[in-house]
Amino acid sequence: MRKIAILSFVILAFTFTAFGQKTKPAKTTSAPAATNDQPVRDAFDRLVEGIKQVDAEKVMSVYQNSDRILFFNNNGTATIGWETMKKNREASYANAANVSLDITGLRVEMLGKDAAYITCKWKQQQEYDGKLETASGRMTLVFKLIGKDWKVIHLHTSPDNPDANRPVLTSERERQ
């Protein structure tokens, strides 16, 4: 009986010792690779500045000039092609003034050395045809490194409350 008591005591002592020890995390020899998302952020900032300045040329310079580029628009429609989107921007910017655009929750995710995406919330206020408008929503932009420049290759915007009174451009209408 005495041997069982001693054995139980030893087991109990080892149990307390094992659970009571504090362990230090193992040191790693290599740090995780740092990602440089600043060039992507810079391209995004140029886009935002172009919108605030109501400058279609500046805005479109951030997008890849391709007839295959796809935009999911704020009004629930889709536009295909850089030229078409440029014409749409020029047409709508002719009626816009005093634009303010606030970006919150900006997140840049690098998908490798030549691809990234940005997600954010946006709130825009502007005069459109002389009337004050406010809109807000979420946006995802996919970027690709083309040559030395980061270009948007896809845009998806989702408004919080779409304005049913805003016109849908001919190029934005669904095709049969």
Where are these regions (language model features)?
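Positively charged n-region of N-terminal signal peptides that target proteins for export
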Residues: 1-4, 21
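Outer-membrane beta-barrel domain signature
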Residues: 128-130
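Short, low-complexity N-terminal intrinsically disordered segments enriched in polar/charged residues
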Residues: 21-62, 170-176
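A solvent-exposed, acidic/Ser-Thr-rich amphipathic alpha-helical stretch
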Residues: 56-111, 133
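Short beta-strand edge/turn micro-motifs at domain boundaries
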Residues: 136-164
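Bacterial N-terminal signal peptides
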Residues: 7-15
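A short hydrophobic beta-strand element
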Residues: 114-124
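Hydrophobic/aromatic beta-strand elements that line small-molecule binding cavities or substrate pockets
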Residues: 89-90, 103-109, 122-124, 138-144
